[in-house]
């Protein structure tokens, strides 16, 4: 019996499976793993193959879902047009802004995101873990910096975090302790200033992404666990 046609068919099937495989997380990534917690409950999982989850992302303005990616873009391209439309001179929607809401007091978050932007600009892009609280920024020479509110900063150049590249991020948090893993490079920080609680933020703990000028923010996978 000539087995060549069968082998050829099997090889073609395997190639099709590889090509069709999603670029984001697989089923294994929905399994709970943590260094800080023994167990957690998956409260949000999204690969952006459907509509926008407004419970976690809020208003759809400036947000589109294309090819399994959530894309966040500026609402306006010029200050004059924005001021005329909004009838104010602040919060003009000239940069992409995204919030992931309903963050538990103890959590594990795994997501993939990317800032598409020609270059770093002062204070941008900004990723806040807790609104105006813990800041995760990109170093100009590559890598990232964790800045605690009114506390110390920690630079981690080994993570290779950069603009225009997908960032694989894992964050584990409880009051006084946060673990940040970027592209497989991770550390745990214990400090009294490690908090996401902002008493001035009436919407509760959330993640805030701000891109600055000439920027789009892309997300392709999110997993959020509430921990005990």
Regions found by a protein language model. Give the residues of each.
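Bacterial N-terminal signal peptides
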Residues: 10-22
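Extracellular carbohydrate-recognition regions
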Residues: 28-61
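Beta-strand-rich interaction surfaces with strong enrichment in secreted/lumenal proteins
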Residues: 33-34, 95-101, 155-161, 208-209
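Short tryptophan-centered beta-strand motifs in secreted/extracellular beta-sheet-rich domains
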Residues: 48, 109-111, 165-182
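Extracellular glycan-recognition surfaces and repeat-rich motifs
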Residues: 52-82
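Secretory/extracellular carbohydrate-interaction modules
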Residues: 76-148
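Short, aromatic/His-centered strand-loop micro-motif at the edge of beta-sheets
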Residues: 148-170
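Flexible glycan-contacting loops in extracellular carbohydrate-active proteins
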Residues: 191-220
């Amino acid at each position: 019996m000539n087995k060549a046609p069968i082998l050829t068919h099997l090889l073609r099937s395997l190639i099709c499976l590889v090509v069709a495989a999603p670029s984001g997380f697989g089923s294994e990534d929905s399994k709970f793993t943590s260094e800080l917690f023994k167990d957690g409950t998956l409260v949000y999982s999204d690969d952006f193959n459907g509509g926008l989850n407004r419970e976690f992302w809020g208003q759809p303005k400036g947000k589109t879902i294309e090819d399994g990616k959530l894309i966040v873009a500026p609402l306006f391209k010029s200050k004059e047009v924005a001021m005329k439309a909004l009838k104010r001179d602040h919060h003009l929607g000239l940069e992409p802004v995204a919030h992931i809401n309903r963050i538990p007091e103890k959590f594990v978050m795994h997501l993939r995101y990317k800032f598409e932007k020609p270059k770093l600009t002062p204070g941008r892009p900004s990723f806040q873990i807790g609104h105006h609280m813990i800041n995760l920024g990109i170093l100009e020479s590559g890598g990232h910096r964790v800045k605690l509110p009114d506390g110390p900063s920690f630079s981690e150049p080994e993570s290779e975090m950069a603009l225009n590249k997908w960032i694989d991020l894992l964050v584990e948090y409880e009051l006084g302790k946060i673990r940040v893993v970027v592209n497989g490079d991770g550390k745990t920080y214990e400090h009294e200033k490690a908090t996401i609680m902002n008493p001035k933020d009436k919407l509760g703990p959330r993640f805030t992404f701000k891109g600055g000028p000439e920027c789009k923010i892309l997300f392709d996978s999110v997993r959020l666990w509430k921990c005990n």
